[in-house]
Amino acid sequence: MIRRRLALAAASAAAVVLLGGVLLRPSAPTLSTEATGDAEIAEWLRTDVGDGARNHLVAAVVTPDGVRYGGLGADERTEVEIGSVTKTMTALLLARSAAEGTVGLEDPAADHADVGGFTGTLEELATHRSGLPRLPAGIGDLASTLVAQLRGTDPYAGWSADDVLRQAADADQGEHVHAYSNLGAAVLGQTLARAEGRDYADLLRERVLDPLGMTATSAPETADALPADAPTGFSATGRPVDAWTMAGYAPAGGVRSTAADMARYAQALLTDDPALGVPAASVLDPRFDADGARIGLGWFTSESEDGGSVTWHNGGTSGYSTMLAMDRERSVAVFVNGDTASSVDELGLRLLERAGEES
């Protein structure tokens, strides 16, 4: 089930990120031979990596015994784009705001932000059941996305928080069934920011990153907020691409982090760390069906081949691919990131299986 769900997600993502490489096809980067950290994990990465352009890889393996890191050309301090794994942090913000009474899960987004006639609730936004399309469907919006992808630039950079809310108001709302939506996740984050009277990046820092000690993680929102030497990645065809900061769409995929910080995040979820501000189960536990999986607040849960389950989210930008997967029963998690758009989903699942067998 999990591989079917991942195949659907990968196919949908490919329609966006592969556009950036269809015109120019330089020689693709090759996988680094520079092993870092734990030699066994570095060898797992080298052995299990799939096809596609590869450059650097890094992994964190979390078990009850602690955290191990390994990489090829990157280590636990290397800054990366985590893409849609950001959505799980936005969902955690929702759970916290709901627990504190600022919002209710069943509140329509329109109760807290100007989204016109859009009727979806905050819970529906967090579970991709709001009826919003994956991306804004206006001709101008679609054209700007296509041009950015062909240029290898951030396709979301021109859309502010106000634009995101406008796009929700203008959208033709579909049925309230599961349909993955970047627009929906962005609307959720910007609506919560309105309700809390903060910018999204500040709200994320105050409610999630600082409490968990994720000091190397941020949502810069604009290219101007990045240092000049901020790392960037490569398309699936090996073309250098710009960083994604995503502006108003930051709640859907704009976070930059490190393997060390993402290991802290996974540990907090596996151990029900009070610093989360809510029980981990409030976001992780499945609530609805989701294309062969089940979905909680931002998190997918799928059956594993050994009869257990995997709770996960993946992420992809024009230049990075990410997988964060957890075996909650064994208290094991794996974070994997590569600085190309070639998927690391299967790599992450294989590493989780290896780690689970050793735990």
Language model feature labels by segment:
Residues A59, D65, V80-E106, L188-A193, ...:
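Active-site SXXK
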Residues G70-T78, Q167-G174:
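Glycine/charged-rich beta-loop-alpha catalytic/anionic-binding loops adjacent to active sites
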